[in-house]
Regions:
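Juxtamembrane/interfacial segments at transmembrane-helix boundaries in multi-pass membrane proteins
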Residues: 92-151
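Conserved G/P- and acidic residue-centered "switch" motifs that form tight phosphate/ATP-binding loops
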Residues: 59, 138, 169
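Extended, hydrophobic alpha-helical segments in both membrane/secreted and soluble proteins
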Residues: 144, 157-163
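Hydrophobic alpha-helical transmembrane segments of multi-pass membrane proteins
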Residues: 8, 86, 129-136, 163-167
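Internal transmembrane alpha-helices of multipass membrane proteins
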Residues: 1-93, 152, 156-157, 166
Length: 169
């Protein structure tokens, strides 16, 4: 299931860079570094077989996206970058709590082992609700979607391409 996302991110990143080839005129080196770090974090997230590594890569994606929006974005880029960062970071706290609960119950962060583990039905319900709320911010779903319009409008074209094409999936 992750291979299509790996292919999508490795195809979309160079296309995004090409789309912004003439538009980005200042701090070009840092811009390219941010995109390559972003691509590395996305691929790491999609190939992780450990819940902790998935979480670290999933959250590390925020840093280059914050920089891409905040440095190379539009007029309200700083506001949009901080709103994006804070919303998605706060949504991730609940994900971390759910992952911690899974680790305490199963004794492992290995994703294949977690899929084989039998969680109590009540715990499954709480984990579902916790992950749903967490991903509702990340995806984004109503009513926790208000960061998205600002991030898309203020991000450079390439940042919007990655945001819409990969990260919101």
């Amino acid at each position: 299931i992750s291979m299509p996302f790996v292919l999508l991110s490795t195809l979309l990143t160079p296309l995004s860079i090409l789309a912004s080839w003439r538009a980005i005129t200042h701090r070009v080196r840092e811009y390219m570094i941010a995109f390559l770090v972003l691509e590395t974090m996305m691929v790491g997230m999609f190939v992780s077989l450990d819940m902790l590594m998935f979480y670290l890569f999933f959250e590390a994606v925020l840093i280059p996206m914050f920089l891409i929006i905040g440095i190379w974005g539009g007029a309200r880029r700083v506001y949009a970058a901080f709103k994006f960062f804070l919303y998605t970071l706060l949504g991730s706290v609940l994900m971390l709590v759910c992952m911690l609960a899974m680790y305490i119950d199963a004794g492992t962060t290995d994703i294949p082992a977690l899929t084989a583990h039998q969680f109590a039905e009540s715990m499954q319900t709480w984990l579902f609700l916790g992950f749903l709320a967490s991903f509702a911010v990340k995806v984004p779903m109503w009513p926790v979607h208000t960061w998205l319009p600002d991030a898309h409008v203020e991000a450079p074209t390439a940042g919007s391409m990655i945001l819409a094409g990969v990260l919101l999936k």
